[in-house]
């Protein structure tokens, strides 16, 4: 099912305190590298000590403050599960479901003995199909699994009528995610492509196919996915909400794409035809190309694609040998990790992925005090006031557009900590007599049925959460005009209750400002106060915005992240605008909060310096070269170093705080500095 279009921060938040309630700087001196000059490389100055003292763990391709907090959250979740598995519970209770599912996730000995038995009946059924029509019937029978289907579907808010859900159809079918992996010809990408072919063949062998058959099937999968890549939009092109909104009727879909059995697949999934009479086709050109591809492919190709779907959806839940082969490619080859996480971590993450809200409810009771929620609400209000002031400060904007922007800001729907409505898991059955894989599929079926029941032909539920409470992240969703800060991010080290306002506004404050700014970035600005994809800008103001936004895209595209690789400033534009806006809004809020009682110097730094050091400290990390290449293709966020060294040179207050002057490496002349929000 389709996930809502949301804009996560990949950054963390915590609760605020009054400006004069703390007295520590919040800084850890050993995290700094005072041999570096802040005006030449602020990232190294602010995080160099941390990088040196925290070498990259073997199980990670990137490790920083964000991952440290995720580790802490994972340990808390694991403590809940370890406590649950010590007891026996009445069948059907949420405790029984969590406990038994966790035990299944931990029981690798059982999975090794079972081998591929849990998926063998499905593979045999596919193998027995004699014709393309037989295979297509199986696609309908197992429609929820999307066997060999190269596009995605699901319900979400109609972006031009956001009170109602609508059926969505969008491009898909690429194991590697980004089309660049199939089409780019630089040495690093070519090496990954060759490794991918070997990996696919190996996986087919591990699922019982002969070496010769595995090689043939792998080639069919690779050629098919390459053909899909050639007709797919790029990650950057997918960021244009207007271009990816194309409403059509089911009748029109059938006329346009006669070889795609969409209605039969939807019916097989449990969706009645009445709920797909109108839909949004995100990428019509892709669907047209896919229609031709699927018409031309023979039965053996479709069979290989369906088998590959089974392999891909089950590889994390079967034997150690299969898991290790999967890790060797995605972990080592793609990202540069040296080893996988231990069993307890993998098991904890798997339970969290399938029954996250059930765990989240327990998590919040144990680890999230109500006082934190109230304090966070206060800080969010402070940041809203500040963003309003920043809107008024944009001299290039007309009064008319500013008024509309204020209206949108005033209507932000703020979610903090945990949802008002918890998921009811009573219809989910976890059966310990069945395999781990079968129980995972039961969880997927439960979620699928729940989404259809709650969204097909139904109004949008604004109280739905798109992250679990224990998630270490935050997001903005334009169709509900909401900002969300789950309980998982409201903890140290991104907030220090004993530190003063400079530290906390520099860390948590920027996080909040970042999410708010997403409502006014290059994508978010296209949605109105109600969340509809509707233009509320004057033509002149829209031109002024785009002119400024283009300068950000160009600036970041000129950054070399590796000697042979530039950043993609157009792909990361929304996040770069949100980082800059978050800094501007939070710094302004910080100055508001301390206007009557300025903070003293602490640990050798002024209050303004501590604000920027706190922000930079959030992004201290170590990362492999392979992961850098991977993220440039797949991650709409700039790399940690450039969320610091790319953002700060455009903020006048940073120059003033650290005495940055002409001749310093990070200096940009004032008339060339970028400003938006």
Residue ranges, per PLM feature:
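Hydrophobic/aromatic-rich, well-ordered segments within soluble, folded domains that form packed cores
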Residues: 31-52, 182, 186-205, 399, ...
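Active-site-surrounding "flap" and adjacent substrate/cofactor-binding loops of secreted or lumenal enzymes
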Residues: 37-40, 45-110
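Intrinsically disordered, low-complexity linker/terminal regions across diverse proteins
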Residues: 70, 256-259, 280-284, 341, ...
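Short secondary-structure subsegments characteristic of cysteine-rich extracellular domains
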Residues: 59-81, 214-231, 504-510, 608-612
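Short, solvent-exposed loop/turn and secondary-structure capping segments
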Residues: 29, 53-57, 153-156, 178-180, ...
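Noncatalytic, helix-rich "gating/capping" subdomain that lines the substrate-entry/channel surface
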Residues: 84-378, 382
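Bacterial Sec-dependent N-terminal signal peptides
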Residues: 1-22
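Short, Gly/Pro- and small/polar-rich lid/capping loops
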Residues: 22-30
